[in-house]
């Protein structure tokens, strides 16, 4: 029996950079392997039993799909995860001895041709739109067209030859642009969010500040008005007379300006008189009445305005009822009525503090008294009518007595 040296050849030889005749300097030369009795183990093997070689070959060569080199595909190297079945490794021999790489080349050529088509598509569309595509071409145009075709061909060859380079560049560029867009969108979203939050806080702070300013201003004005009113109330009544005289001067100035000037009586005179009377009466309420609440102040103001509004409404209603238009004289009468009513309310409130509060009751009592007076007048007229009727009956009785005969009168006299 001859011991022949057969180096263990497998598909793993293609992964290493060693040749068939290389010797590992650390472990020494390869021992001889007896294929008949199997007494000699494979080189550098850790197996004690040659029968375990088929079971543990996956551990020996670390067969794993995740660590399989890319040169080994599923057709050339069959990998199993079970340890009992050894991998079925074999080589595929082609008739030509080389792999078929025609499909990837065609794919590369097609992908490289795509940018050229996309680049030429706008030019072709423009020429079609102008109706100048291959039409009326001269020598210069055909020369330019041939040069352009040459450039496109060279570009196609260049793109096909450097396919991996420019595809990686395009891929990196697209990924970079996508990341830029993503980062930009996230940044803009954060900016919008921060801006909205900032504006909301600004609006909130501004509203709180304005509310505090309004509150402080209102308190300050209320204190000023209260101090002024208390000071005037504690002073003599001559201040009230001075205010009334000032009011009268303003109203008469308006009258004279409207009479001899160019003021519109309907707007300037009536509205100014109402506003002046309301404002001065409001001030009078602060001076004369012994309370300083807004409730009584506004009640007096609305009562005065209500009375003046009633006068204006009645006047307007009467003019429209009788189909009359108010001329300058009518406006003077209306303004005079408002002026008289305002003065009357002013003096009445000055002499009797709190009179405006009692005015509704006074008006109701006045209306009731007026109606009672009308009723009494009606009763008196009825009594006068009854008396007149009795007088008529008396006259009728006297006429009946004159119609009696003389004989009957003698008999009655004897009886």
Swiss-Prot record:
Pfam families: WTF. GO terms for cellular component: ascus epiplasm; cytoplasm; endoplasmic reticulum membrane; vacuolar membrane. Residues 1-49, 67-99 are annotated as: Disordered. Keywords: Cytoplasm, Endoplasmic reticulum, Membrane, Toxin, Transmembrane, Transmembrane helix, Vacuole. Belongs to the WTF family. This is Meiotic driver wtf36. It comes from the Eukaryota. The keyword Transmembrane applies. InterPro entries: WTF. The keyword Ribonucleoprotein does not apply. Homomer. Forms protein aggregates. The two isoforms can interact with each other and with themselves. High sequence similarity is required for their interaction. Promotes unequal transmission of alleles from the parental zygote to progeny spores by acting as poison/antidote system where the poison and antidote proteins are produced from the same locus; the poison component is trans-acting and targets all spores within an ascus whereas the antidote component is spore-specific, leading to poisoning of all progeny that do not inherit the allele. The chain crosses the membrane at residues 105-125, 142-162, 169-189, 205-225, 240-260, 274-294, 298-318. One of its GO terms (biological process) is meiotic drive. Residues 11-29 have a biased composition (Basic and acidic residues).
